[in-house]
Amino acid sequence: MQFPSPVPVQWIGDLIQAKITGNDKAYATGINELHKVEAGDLVFVDHPKYYEKCINSAADFIIINKETNVPEGKALLIVENPFEAYCKIVNHFRPFTPAEKMINDTSVIGEGSYICPSAFIGNKVTIGKNCIIHPQVSIMDYCII
């Protein structure tokens, strides 16, 4: 998930009540899972098995539950529960918005696409051209098809 605009890592640290070590003047551009991270992203790790992989990933900011050496240019955000901190950040930038109808007005449906009755299309969904969404299918918020 990309943030609407770059966010100071200090602000994120305050949000999740983290101790920051390393590059505390930088800006994060998004938050992602370990297998999807890019430069500028935040990622979390809460198991020793994945510490090295996470610290050496493309992510510039690592939410972690232990102090360790910080690679050049990166920052560690040290908290007791990294997953809880990760969820708090995601919920801040993408809070739950209840659906008020089956096909949300904020969604974009491509030319030639057909949505069958009883299909659910969530908030800010993008469906490309010439797609068929069958009955009883649910496409949740922010999905791109």
Positions of PLM-derived features:
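Structural signal for interior beta-strand "rungs" in well-ordered beta-sheet cores
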Residues: F44, M102-I145
